[in-house]
């Protein structure tokens, strides 16, 4: 698969998703999607990622809330923490298509956090984070699975797509502290249930800053993203 294809698809995908987040920065009575001229594949992938961003971050919600200030303190920290979450979640999924959708979804979930904190400028590196992670971990199994050719067909089989237009999954950038605490308690409950089911510490969501920022593999990925951003025109 040509690298240019990956760049073109993901640049368009993330630009579209970030524009969608932008609509919710100011309260709206109604949200209408207009002026979209994407290919069917990007439209379907966009729908899947928009819904799945709520699924993929559930177990990581306590981690995101605990480290929100650090994550949105600089572009480097934003990239580092996003890579940490990706590395410690996506690679556990078996289906390459699930991995790709989860990767996009986690990146958008972190972008949503940056919008909530008024630091949406960091979300501009979303597509570059994906492209580096794709080349490192997703590309070979994704191509063996059928690549972009069969991805749309796979997405259309996912039952969670019915949630795409539901207001329940729209961003809420005006949460009260009480609302945030309720979300946190629910996420911690779900995480504990997952730990009990799998009989292991399901994900390293209790990792501290040193464990994240001093991880050599994560630092390597972050360096590649930063260098890629510097090379972009």
PLM region spans:
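Core of folded catalytic or high-affinity ligand/protein-binding domains
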Residues: 61-148
């Amino acid at each position: 698969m040509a690298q240019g294809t990956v760049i073109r698809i993901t640049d368009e995908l993330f630009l579209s998703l970030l524009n969608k987040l932008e609509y919710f920065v100011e309260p709206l009575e109604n949200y209408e999607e207009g002026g979209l001229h994407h290919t069917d594949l990007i439209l379907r992938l966009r729908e899947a990622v928009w819904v799945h961003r709520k699924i993929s971050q559930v177990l990581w919600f306590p981690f995101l809330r605990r480290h929100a200030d650090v994550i949105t303190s600089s572009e480097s920290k934003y990239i580092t923490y996003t890579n940490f979450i990706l590395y410690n979640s996506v690679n556990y999924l078996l289906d390459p298509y699930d991995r790709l959708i989860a990767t996009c979804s986690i990146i958008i979930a972190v972008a949503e956090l940056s919008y909530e904190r008024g630091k949406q400028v960091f979300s501009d590196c979303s597509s570059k984070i994906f492209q580096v992670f794709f080349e490192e971990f997703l590309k070979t199994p994704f191509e063996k699975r059928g690549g972009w050719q069969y991805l749309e067909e796979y997405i259309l089989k996912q039952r969670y797509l019915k949630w795409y237009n539901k207001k329940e999954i729209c961003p809420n950038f005006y949460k009260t502290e009480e609302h945030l605490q309720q979300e946190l308690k629910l996420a911690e409950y779900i995480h504990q249930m997952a730990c009990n089911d799998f009989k292991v510490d399901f994900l390293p969501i209790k990792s501290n800053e040193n464990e994240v920022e001093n991880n050599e593999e994560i630092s390597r990925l972050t360096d590649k993203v930063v260098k890629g951003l510097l090379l972009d025109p």
